[in-house]
């Protein structure tokens, strides 16, 4: 009964004229960002944060979250029509989506993708609604010891699953923590690593850092390759047949579950959800050999999982205060800039914000379903603009966004610096996600650590006095060492195959 009452309260907030407009704008901009190569949801959210300073927290988060899941559908449009994924998660859709487009069924593919995205997002939102109560009640029992262990688990999961090299991921995590230490010591009030620069007294702003790492670096990398004019597939009807709908029901249901479940796990990207959904459909199909030739299930499953993952990834943020991806970390940073800490206390102390934003997920998914299909022609025209011009426009907005955070040229310099740093890190295959996660979670982790040590008078034994903290820390260690065991097992197999091992 409490859930129903809270949802009614949430919808009364989400359906106000201002919040409806913000959800519409976020969905529209999110789709545009998803369509355009060279800028992802993390940089897109970071660019919009300065615009939210004059808004209330509910409207600000509605704008950012609607942009986030709007990008998921935007990447589908170019995947189907041009065989070019606007987002990494839509790459798998190219296989059957573009094949359908060449058969003159691009409209059907996009319609099924839109319907699947709507159902997947709604499924994940329902999961959030019913998970919020139990998870927040459990997390309300946490003290600083348990919160430190929980943050360590979130960081270790993202680090342990972030790419091929755990060592590189750990290095990036430490780098992010070092950045988080810059500024005034929250306990003693003394400056740390500021080098007598007034601009560093408040620390390194995460908005220019993220815009540089995920926006400018992406543009620099894309600028190396000339963008040829893509051949646009022709589109006929948008209305799927009854057989198309029947063939999509199973993939949409499976994709909803896969995307929501994997969205809960920090470090698992929506690309992984889309790929696993595609694999699941091939295994479930009576004709797996036809995948890649225009199977509707190859579009419905991955696209549903993609959007379900985007909404499912918000569950650990809202209930536990743990971001599961760089974009979610940016949204968490926006919460903090508005004086709110996402997690169990959000539902207790700011229920109107929590439930208003959750209700807006339903609204945003409906807006995306209604909005995107009629606007496909506009998105295609935007894609015909030369990439050099698009780059210039995007970079101008980035510079303006970085400057508007604190009206400081220093923030612009930080963005440009981290754009170059991000570009170089990409070249050497260093993951960027751990930097963002530790930069935002670093201050929270430090505060929990120091509060715990003050309670125990400097004894680290306090972290093993709590059963919950002990389990969480053990899981954190497991996620960090698991890749090393995997590497060892591979090495053992190679030696045995040589015939020289005993």
Where are each of the predicted segments found?
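Helix-loop-helix hairpins and the membrane-proximal interhelical loops
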Residues: 1-60, 191-295, 380, 397-403, ...
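Transmembrane alpha-helix interface/packing and boundary motifs in multi-pass membrane proteins
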Residues: 27-41, 71-83, 158-163, 257-266, ...
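Short helix-coil transition sites and intra-membrane helix breaks within transmembrane domains
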Residues: 33-42, 80-91, 123-127, 262-271, ...
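Re-entrant/interfacial helical elements at transmembrane boundaries that shape
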Residues: 41-51, 64, 79-99, 130, ...
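Flexible loop linkers connecting adjacent transmembrane helices
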Residues: 47, 81-108, 134, 143, ...
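Membrane-interface alpha-helices at helix entry/exit sites of multi-pass transporters
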Residues: 58-62, 99-116, 286-298, 326-329, ...
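A structural-propensity feature for long, helix-poor, extended segments
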Residues: 68-80, 86, 295-320, 324, ...
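Membrane-embedded alpha-helical modules
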Residues: 111-227, 337-491
């Amino acid at each position: 009964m409490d859930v129903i009452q809270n949802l009614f309260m949430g919808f009364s907030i989400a359906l106000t004229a201002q919040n409806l407009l913000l959800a519409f704008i976020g969905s529209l901009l999110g789709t545009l960002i998803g369509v355009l190569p060279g800028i992802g949801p993390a940089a897109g959210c970071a660019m919009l944060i300065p615009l939210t300073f004059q808004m209330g927290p509910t409207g600000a988060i509605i704008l950012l979250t609607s942009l986030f899941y709007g990008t998921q559908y935007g990447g589908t449009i170019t995947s189907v029509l041009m065989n070019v994924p606007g987002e990494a998660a839509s790459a798998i859709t190219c296989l059957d989506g573009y094949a359908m487009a060449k058969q003159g069924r691009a409209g059907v593919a996009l319609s099924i993708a839109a319907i699947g995205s709507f159902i997947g997002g709604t499924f994940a939102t329902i999961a959030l609604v019913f998970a919020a109560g139990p998870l927040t009640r459990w997390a309300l029992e946490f003290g600083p010891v348990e919160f430190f262990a929980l943050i360590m688990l979130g960081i270790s999961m993202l680090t342990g699953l972030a790419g091929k090299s755990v060592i590189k991921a750990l290095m990036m995590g430490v780098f992010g923590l070092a950045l988080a230490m810059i500024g005034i010591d929250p306990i003693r009030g003394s400056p740390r690593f500021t080098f007598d620069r007034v601009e560093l007294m408040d620390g390194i702003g995460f908005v220019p850092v993220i815009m540089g790492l995920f926006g400018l670096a992406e543009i620099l990398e894309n600028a190396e390759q000339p963008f040829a004019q893509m051949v646009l597939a022709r589109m006929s009807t948008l209305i799927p047949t009854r057989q198309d709908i029947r063939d999509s029901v199973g993939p949409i249901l499976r994709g909803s579950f896969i995307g929501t479940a994997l969205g809960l796990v920090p470090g698992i990207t929506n690309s992984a959800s889309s790929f696993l959904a595609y694999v699941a459909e091939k295994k479930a199909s009576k004709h797996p050999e036809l995948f890649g030739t225009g199977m509707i299930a190859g579009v419905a499953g991955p696209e549903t999982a993609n959007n379900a993952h985007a909404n499912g990834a918000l569950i650990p943020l809202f209930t536990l205060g743990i971001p599961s991806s760089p974009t979610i970390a940016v949204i968490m940073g926006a919460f903090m800039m508005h004086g709110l800490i996402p997690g169990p206390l959000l539902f207790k102390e700011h229920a109107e914000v929590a439930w208003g934003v959750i209700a807006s997920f339903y609204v945003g998914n409906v807006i995306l379903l209604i909005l995107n299909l009629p606007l496909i022609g506009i998105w295609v025209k935007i894609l015909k603009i030369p990439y050099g011009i698009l780059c210039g426009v995007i970079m101008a907005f980035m510079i303006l966004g970085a400057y508007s955070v604190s009206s400081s040229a220093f923030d612009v310099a930080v963005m440009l610096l981290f754009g170059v740093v991000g570009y170089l890190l990409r070249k050497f295959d260093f993951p960027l996600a751990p930097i963002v996660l530790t930069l935002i979670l670093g201050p929270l982790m430090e505060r929990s650590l120091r509060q715990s040590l003050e309670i125990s008078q400097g004894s680290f034994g306090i972290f093993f006095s709590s059963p919950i903290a002990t389990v969480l820390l053990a899981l954190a260690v497991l996620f960090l060492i698991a890749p090393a065991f995997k590497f060892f097992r591979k090495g053992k197999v190679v030696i045995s195959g040589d015939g020289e091992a005993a």
